[in-house]
Amino acid sequence: MTIAVPSFNQGRFLDDALTSIFQQEIPVEVFVMDGGSSDNSVDVIRKWGHRLCGWRSHADEGQAAAINEAISQGLAPYVCWLNSDDWFLPSGLRKLLDELTIYPDAPAVYGRSWNVVQYSGKRTPVWVEPFHERRLALRCIISQPATLIRRSAWEAVGGVDGALHMAMDYDLWWRLYRQCGPLKFLDDFVAVNREHEATKTKTLRRRHYQEAMSVVRKHHGSVPLKWWLAQPYAVWFKSRFG
């Protein structure tokens, strides 16, 4: 499978991400797209250079563009991306791949993931649910690092939308569903989402809600009341308690 690893100034986490990829029990082609980091990221990338199918480090047009660039360079029939501050659990990719093999009509599969707070180590399960349009309209029920997509479906929808910066994954799930059919849910933990002080959904919470609501409106036709009620509370809670 083809794995894109977009990264920018995440050298302290990047080694964990790459280690988790190469510990998987399946053949992978990995492309690291670094946005011109000023930390130790390039040193980490060079450490893994002999295992990578490609990498670069220079200013780019953002995360979505980097993901599309990486996946376009690969040839494998399955694709995914792993943000450099997240990681896969042992055998996680194998479980996802097996599920797509069993269900050949599914454009993508997603499993469960943990959310780990960096400073405290607190671990909680990410809210994930079996796929249904109504559930997807109420919230993003899919955890991005716990997903695997058929390349044919990825190419059919044109990859991630480069105009989006906060909800590009949420938008992708909608487009895969609309154009290729329901995504398959795997009831097993396969990945970990790391929450830290620089996480975009933490530092840009209001913008994240606004972008996600625009995605719902675009693909579902209306924004459920739950979004309007949850937005101010979530912004306040994050600003107050972190």
Q: What do these predicted regions represent?
A:
Residues 19-28:
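Short, acidic, metal-binding catalytic loop of nucleotide-sugar glycosyltransferases
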Residues 27-36, 56-59:
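Short beta-strand/loop segment that forms part of the nucleotide-sugar
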Residues 40, 65, 86-99:
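Acidic donor-binding/catalytic loop of UDP-sugar-dependent glycosyltransferases
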Residues 58-74:
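Glycine-rich, basic loop-to-helix element that forms the pyrophosphate-binding segment
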Residues 79:
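Short aromatic/hydrophobic "clamp" motif used to bind/position activated sugar donors
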Residues 128-211, 215:
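Conserved nucleotide-sugar donor-binding catalytic segment
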